[in-house]
Amino acid sequence: MSGEQTPMCSMDLREIKGKETNMADSYHGMSWYEQYIQPCVVELLGSALFIFIGCLSVIENSPNTGLLQPALAHGLALGLIIATLGNISGGHFNPAVSLAVTLVGGLKTMLLIPYWVSQLFGGMIGAALAKVVSPEERFWNASGAAFAIVQEQEQVAEALGVEIVMTMLLVLAVCMGAVNEKTMGPLAPFSIGFSVIVDILAGGGISGACMNPARAFGPAVMAGYWDFHWIYWLGPLLAGLFVGLLIRLFIGDEKTRLILKSR
């Protein structure tokens, strides 16, 4: 080999700086609507579609399929909707995910509350549509797809623990697959969907494997079922907080971590 070669590290630095400049230019070129309104509209739309499909899969679930039908419906629907709409809003459709993504720097803090509002309204719309298209008897037999599995105080600790752990897996899949630069990749929507399938199959019999306050809230409003509803807020939001701190402190890339930096 002849001639001088550009050092690889210098080349990489220039490429990285160029990418950062292009991303910044692209972001600043976006309109106010595209930065602040459009993502909230997409979060509302995506949440409505996801929760509509999820609720129907529970209401119309055959006893012979057990957890398989809702697990596949929730996971495949979420992966599909993220792949379709994720480039606009990030594809959260879940207040716990939005909390974690905000903590790791993937979402502007000022957008967190608007995202939550959009997701909750989307949840109500999706649950309302499911109620409209479902036979009344099946709807009420399934408690409107609300989470009614916890019936006794003795079940609370187990259900809360399952919600925390299962939601942590989902939120890790989102943050590491779609936000953290070192580990993000094009298969993130599928890994996120798979995490939902796995979570429901594993924990559905204990807590219902909600992992999403919006998924719990919409059906609860439509069915008027609020027993132990707080579990499906506290568990997922604690999980989002834990994962955000875990990534910020230990497993995030150099740009994301707050401690243990190389320089």
Swiss-Prot record:
Offer a single GO CC term for the protein.
apical part of cell
Q: What does the UniProt entry state concerning the protein's domains?
A: Aquaporins contain two tandem repeats each containing three membrane-spanning domains and a pore-forming loop with the signature motif Asn-Pro-Ala (NPA).
Name the glycosylated positions. N141
**Could you tell me what this protein is called?**
Aquaporin-8
Per UniProt, subcellular location reads as: Cell membrane; Mitochondrion inner membrane; Apical cell membrane; Basolateral cell membrane
Sequence intervals crossing the membrane: 39-59, 87-107, 110-130, 159-179, 186-206, 231-251
Q: Where is this motif: NPA 1?
A: 94-96
Name the chemical reaction catalysed here: H2O(in) = H2O(out); NH4(+)(in) = NH4(+)(out); H2O2(out) = H2O2(in); formamide(out) = formamide(in)
Residue numbers of Cysteine sulfenic acid (-SOH) PTMs: C55
Give a brief account of the tissues where this protein occurs.
Answer: Highly expressed in sperm, pancreas and liver. Expressed in hepatocytes, acinal cells of pancreas and salivary gland, and absorptive colonic epithelial cells. Expressed in the myoepithelium of submandibular and parotid glands. Expressed in pancreatic beta-cells. Expressed in testis but not in epididymis. Expressed in small intestine.
Per the entry, induction is: Up-regulated by glucagon.
Sorted alphabetically, which PROSITE patterns does this protein's record hold?
MIP
Keywords, comma-separated and alphabetical: Cell membrane, Endoplasmic reticulum, Glycoprotein, Membrane, Mitochondrion, Mitochondrion inner membrane, Oxidation, Repeat, Transmembrane, Transmembrane helix, Transport
Q: How is it modified after translation?
A: N-glycosylated.
Identify a single GO molecular function assigned to this protein. water channel activity
Q: How does it sit in the membrane?
A: Multi-pass membrane protein
Residues that the record marks as modified (Cysteine persulfide) are: C55
According to its UniProt entry, what is the function of this protein? Channel that allows the facilitated permeation of water and uncharged molecules, such as hydrogen peroxide and the neutral form of ammonia (NH3), through cellular membranes such as plasma membrane, inner mitochondrial membrane and endoplasmic reticulum membrane of several tissues. The transport of ammonia neutral form induces a parallel transport of proton, at alkaline pH when the concentration of ammonia is high. However, it is unclear whether the transport of proton takes place via the aquaporin or via an endogenous pathway.
Task: Provide the membrane-side ranges marked Cytoplasmic in the record.
Answer: 1-38, 108-109, 180-185, 252-263
Task: Specify the superkingdom.
Answer: Eukaryota
